[in-house]
Amino acid sequence: EVNQAKINDFNSYDGYSLKYIGKQESISGNLTLAGLNYYDPSAVMTKVCTRAIDESVVKLQKKYEEFKIKTPLFSVEPLTAKIGMKEGVTEKCRYEVLEPVIDENGRTSYKRVGVIAPVGGKIWDNRYMAVEEKAEGSNLTETTFKKVSGGNFHPGMLIREISVN
């Protein structure tokens, strides 16, 4: 149900500010045209642009903390989350599992309780038109992970990509 009063309050509030973080460029390289009508240039351009934008966002996520993916664990048996190749998930990625902790002032902070890694062959290909091109992993609906360290994970705990050297 739409609450028009809340929408109006949000739209009229002038206390929001934006801070420029950075920029990223991307070049569309090896694009598979499978699943496209070759005679429809707008469909080809849409796929090229969408994939390039997704790639740029992934690069921003790797470079700036503000852009890092934070998403809940969807399940724990098996460990899954609703992220995939569109968000830059590869077998080399590592994610910290975060548990919310509420202090005496009611503020929420997050404590690391473990680290997980994507399982090869079980990474969801959720990129634009991956299903149409029959890409590996496009038949999945989430990415499966394995525990690297820690334990006692619960659905809903946040995961966040960490840098691994």
Model-found features: residue ranges?
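Surface-exposed, polar/charged interaction patches used for macromolecular assembly or partner binding
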Residues: 1-165
